[in-house]
Amino acid sequence: MSTPVIAASTTAALSTPTTAVPVIALDHVNIEIDGHALQVPKGSMIIQAADKIGVNIPRFCYHDKLPIAANCRMCLVEVEKSPKPQPACATPVMEGMKIHTQSERALSAQRNVMEFLLINHPLDCPICDQGGECELQDVAMGYGRSVSRFTEDKRVVADEDLGPLIATEMTRCIHCTRCVRFMDEIAGTSEIGGMGRGETLEIGTYIGRSISTELSGNIIDLCPVGALTNKVFRFRARPWELVARAHIGYHDSLHSNLYLHTRRGEAMRAVPRDNEAINESWLSDRDRFSHEALTHPDRAIKPRVKSGGIWRDADWPGAISFVKDHLREITTLHGADQLGVLVGGTASAEDYLLLNRFARGLGSNNIDHRLRQLDFSDDMARSLAPKLSAPLADIEHARAILLMGCNPRYNAPLLGHRVRKAWKRGAKVYAINPADFDFHFQLEQKLIGHAQNQVGYALALAKAAAEASATAAPAELAPLLTGALVSDNARAMIDSLMANQPSRILFGEHAAQHPSAAVLRACAKFVAAVTGAGFDEIPDTSNAAAAWRMGAVPHRSVGGVSVATPGLNARQMIEQPRRAYILCAAEINDFALGNHVLEAIAKADCVIVIGSFVNPTLETLAHVILPSALPPETEGTYVNAEGIVQTVQAATKASVDVRACWRILRVLGAEMGLPGFVFNDYAELHAELTEALALNLAQPGVCELSVPARSHERGLVLQALTSIYSTDAVLRRSAALQATVIAAKPAVHLHPDDALGIGVSAGAAVTLGSAILAVEIDRSVPKGGFLVAAGLDSTLDLPITGSVVQLQKR
């Protein structure tokens, strides 16, 4: 029988056989693969050694990121002195081992396995989404028979609904169990398994429900056949019609690497792009499926100007002239300080740089990107930008981790994956959080409390650190520690952080957006300093690290240079309304102050929206809308939590009248005669940006810390938490993500004891502000508090986190 094409091409690529060389390293062994001598680490599997030298061994169940299962047997090879072929994925190398992957014995075994795998596989290739990129197709071409000898009835498996993201055709399943192992080992949710045995084995969920992990889309990539496919992409295009464009995810501060697959400029799907330093070979669901919002009906596609309360389409020169005239009038009559610039967290570094130039060029220092932040009292003590203390990949090697106001599963899913890897290696994980989040790892100790109690827990932790290390707390923090009550849990956390090195403290978005964030941050930094732990401040929005560096804060300009007269921060710009606002890449849902934003902006004489989406609320408030491109539609630079700078090119085409934000600002700045807006193209702007990103001129000072007096009002303490799929305008418009079981629903989450205290049960309605919300009984909520999802249209009218609220039963 002729040698398969796959095997033949591999054989041709090998070098001339050589004799084995002596062992040099004690932890290595000498082996031979198809006459090719090499040294490999002890404990390596044959398939790993073969991959190292480019020898292709067919496989279905093996994946280098998953535990070995040896289910499919497709990788059978001949090992000299072994009585039968051995699975290359599960056979460890041994000194002097000689392996043959192309011998007649090996090829016969592989062909036989291939025949068995195809016995029950349907001939769906013409209608299967996997066609053209299917591992089974590829291997069958090399090792399959042209005619099947099987004449019995094929089995048929009923499909299961795994939710809005993953389509199932389980008759195609070959039982490789990649999806099962991914859920068990990587996602940590164990939602999929094999039921039955032999030919009756079926892969499915244990209790027949949708998958709830935030990493579920990865099983689409792992599936070697068409059993699990992308439901959003289903039947939309063939792989050979698509062009792969390198890009990044922009919904958290990790900036996972990905490819956007486009057809004629339209995004069809997203798949992971390997980068071991950031996302390995995985992708979160929100980075994978959010692209469907690029063509949402809410997209702003033409410049529009409001005249006499009526919206009309305008051309770009007319819209720019409108903005120029109104800004000139307001700044001339009322002063430049009457301009407030509020920008979202998904803008590019170029956008932040030019917004900083534009605002300060007009004479206003009122610019901020921290729309969800409530406490700005330690601004002058901050470093250049929030970032990790060490490479992201090092987190998985930590021996102790403290999560402070951090839910890495939802804040940054692939950061949560790193924490899980550390836990699996024996790391002890601790938490001080506003809720008992459903982690995919176990906590050694936890302090769960509502917003007021979290401050007490942080102070107790800092005091325990001071006592354990015999170190005096900083002058600004010391007075607050006097009355702190140190618990055994706090002492245990400190002892573990000191004893288990390296250790890390992950300071998350729930801490950064706390009404006493400065105190929490000071406590975390002090604990890190005395225990030797790394202090990792995770940026709470996608490109916050770039926004800080490019001066999108009121007290610093580019490179962290302090300004002589700091402007108003985001909260002050709302509490002290301005006459003119520029809203760039931001919606009302992005603010912590909710209804106060509506009231403040409604009073303005001119509201300029530079954004990608419009809705009735924005149309009511705005006077001019300048449609801007989304990150996949334009070039831009992004800085992730580790400080890695990545510049991407446009992957998809924007509508004809949509412009990149930096282009809009360039024309607007030039029209207004401001300095720094005359450059010919993106290359010139990027060169300036590169120089600016290299600067670190921040001079952190000291700050005064205080804790608000504890409220003794009757009621429950509110904690507003932004949902995993509500963090930005794009995610809020991704229909598939909003249909998942982990997407937040408008509800009040109450501890059972508190629900009993106010006389409500699950499903009952309560009034919160102007909203009427259903009650959900949730034991993860601390007693004395309640949780509400922020970022939703129905929860805009919320008091701020930490407010004491009396819920009214309907």
Residue ranges of each PLM-predicted region?
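A cross-kingdom feature strongest in bacterial/archaeal respiratory oxidoreductases
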Residues: 2, 57, 62, 338, ...
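N-terminal export/assembly segments and adjacent metallocofactor-ligating motifs
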Residues: 2-12, 16-45, 51, 59, ...
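Long hydrophobic segments that form regular secondary structure
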Residues: 264-281, 286-296, 300-306, 315, ...
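Short, structured coil segments at secondary-structure junctions
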Residues: 362-363, 425, 441-443, 523, ...
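A generic structural motif
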Residues: 364-378, 426-436, 530-546, 604-615
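Short alpha-helices
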Residues: 434-435, 441-474, 517, 526, ...
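Phosphate/pyrophosphate-binding active-site segments
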Residues: 444, 455-512
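A glycine-rich, hydrophobic/aromatic-adjacent loop/helix-cap motif
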Residues: 503-575, 719
